[in-house]
A protein has these predicted regions:
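Short, positively charged and aromatic/hydrophobic N-terminal segments
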Residues: 3, 29-30, 40, 47-49, ...
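Membrane-anchoring hydrophobic segments
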Residues: 54-136
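Short basic (Lys/Arg) and small-residue
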Residues: 60-70, 74-78, 204-205, 229-304, ...
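Membrane-interface segments at loop-to-transmembrane junctions
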Residues: 69-85, 119-137, 162-183, 203-215, ...
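Transmembrane alpha-helix detector for multi-pass membrane proteins
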Residues: 90, 94-106, 122-199, 224-231, ...
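Hydrophobic alpha-helical transmembrane segments and immediately flanking/interface helices
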Residues: 152-164, 200-219, 292-295, 303
Length: 491
């Protein structure tokens, strides 16, 4: 979806390429758009845009489909062993290279008979040996203490917010980089210690670990720097604001990958067959839409995805319905649908709201009783719903190069997102005027932004909230106070 389509006179004649289309500035007020030839792009076309105009949406014939997730890549991102193992291999190769350099330096000095310089190098390496020994003995203790504290912090965050924040920690690049550098420093220090010789005579010594000693000092400095960054990132994970902000940013990233365009305009025809799920049971995490579109085009059929992204599927249940012909060959459908043990935000538009709602519900529970956290979650929920209020939602039609619908994918509609955002929270807010006031303000703001055909669900939740407060709050003045819209709750 393009935002602006205006070019200045000084850019006249320049071409730009992106989003699968090429833009040519032909005057200060008009822009010619021509499609770039791609496997999933439409035929070339040109569009003239009036001055100051914006693209509200683009047809789903030419959008860039989200790249499918690689099961191996996702498995490696969800584990903690791959990065340290890679670090071990890299640091071992680095040690071999440093050893060769040290041997070459000693051999060069002996050929030049520079025994005074060689004696100075031996003295430096002996002084550095004390530092290397200290590093090797203290590094594992340091690693254990740091990550023990970190795991306690993550446990506290998951208990106060939601268990889903553990996934944020596991997939954090800074966490894996810190662990990798710490362990690599420890391993490298052991390798350097094995390179020291007991011989100190410059005429007899074979190797002096000069480069190795310098590298271990560099790794030590990098470890200290990453320790500061890692502690800062872990402390942010314990705060509500940064966690909620990251969930919101990830949700908007998913929203940016969604196709834009009208749906439901082409009738797929009667259902002729179904394809069942034959893999392991799990949550539908990812759909390779490009592969399914190609398979449907070659078979000249229309495929319809039965479960939504985020649904739990078990072997033997139908995942695809075929319209207008026979089932495509199995090898063409292989790896087109991926499942996982839990939901992800890659293609799941509703999962961000699910996480925000979970945090709000945990905050409103009697064991936590933190309405301010619930208000922070409602801030992001209203922000997200305001962003999608005028966007096309629900069923998505994926088309081939000829513009024919080949894959129909059901997604959450406006009413589904509104119910997910407010239904459960509304059941728990009767005793918290701070949250009811923020909820009323959020609903009123969305009523101003939503089109007429989407106001019904908002009005329903607003009326149900009023009924909930009137039913649970006996004093009229308290009811009036609890239903007064306030974007800060009570401030």
């Amino acid at each position: 979806c393009l935002s602006f389509a205006v070019c200045s006179p000084r850019r006249h004649g320049k071409q730009y390429q992106g989003f699968g289309v090429r833009f040519t500035c032909v005057s200060g007020a008009y822009l010619v758009v021509s499609a770039v030839r791609r496997a999933d792009a439409t035929s070339a076309s040109a569009v003239r845009v009036a001055p100051g105009a914006t693209f509200a949406s683009m047809s789903d014939r030419g959008y860039r489909r989200p790249r499918p997730l690689s099961p191996l890549r996702e498995h490696l991102r969800d584990t903690f062993w791959f990065a340290p193992t890679t670090g071990f291999v890299c640091v071992f190769v680095l040690w071999l290279i440093a050893t060769e350099l040290d041997d070459a330096i000693v051999a060069l000095l002996r050929r030049e008979e520079a025994y005074d310089e060689l004696s100075q190098l031996i003295a430096f390496s002996q002084d550095a040996k004390t530092i290397v020994t200290t590093i090797s003995s203290a590094m594992m203790t340091f690693i254990g203490v740091v990550f023990s504290i970190s795991l306690v912090a993550v446990q506290m965050a998951s208990g106060q917010l939601t268990p889903r924040v553990v996934r944020i920690f596991v997939r954090s690049r800074i966490s894996k980089l810190t662990l990798t550098v710490f362990l690599a420093t420890f391993l490298f220090s052991l390798l350097v210690l094995s390179s020291y010789e007991s011989e100190t005579d410059p005429r007899l010594v074979v190797s002096v670990p000069l480069v190795q000693s310098l590298l271990i000092l560099v790794l030590l400095g990098l470890s200290l720097l990453l320790f500061v960054v890692y502690v800062s990132a872990t402390l942010r994970l314990m705060q509500v604001g940064p966690v909620v902000d990251k969930i919101a940013r990830d949700s908007f990233r998913v929203l940016g990958r969604l196709p834009r365009g009208p749906g439901g305009e082409d009738d797929p025809g009667p259902e002729t067959a179904r394809v069942t799920h034959e893999g392991r049971a799990g949550v539908l995490r990812d759909v390779n839409t490009a592969r399914l579109v190609r398979a449907a085009r070659r078979q000249d059929v229309v495929l319809r995805l039965i479960p939504r992204i985020g649904d739990f599927v078990v072997p033997g249940t139908p995942v695809l319905a075929v319209h207008g012909g026979s089932v495509p060959p199995r090898h063409r459908l292989r790896s087109s649908v991926s499942v996982s043990v839990e939901r992800t935000l890659h293609q799941d538009l509703a999962f961000g709201l699910r996480q925000l709602t979970d945090i709000a519900l945990r905050a409103l529970s009697t064991s936590v009783n933190d309405p301010t956290t619930a208000v922070q979650c409602l801030d992001r929920i209203v922000q997200f719903l305001a962003a999608v209020a005028r966007l096309p939602l629900g069923t998505v039609h994926h088309r081939d190069r000829a513009g024919r619908v080949r894959l129909v994918q059901d997604g959450p509609g406006w009413d589904d997102l509104v119910d997910l955002a407010f239904e459960e929270i509304r059941w728990c807010v009767a005793g918290s005027p701070q949250v009811t006031r923020r909820l009323m303000a959020g609903l009123d703001d969305l009523l101003l932004l939503a089109p007429e055909d989407r106001k019904k669900s908002l009005l329903r939740h607003r009326e149900l909230l009023v009924q909930t407060v009137e039913r649970n709050v006996a004093v009229a003045a308290d009811r009036e106070f609890a239903l007064l819209p306030d974007r800060q709750g009570i401030g």
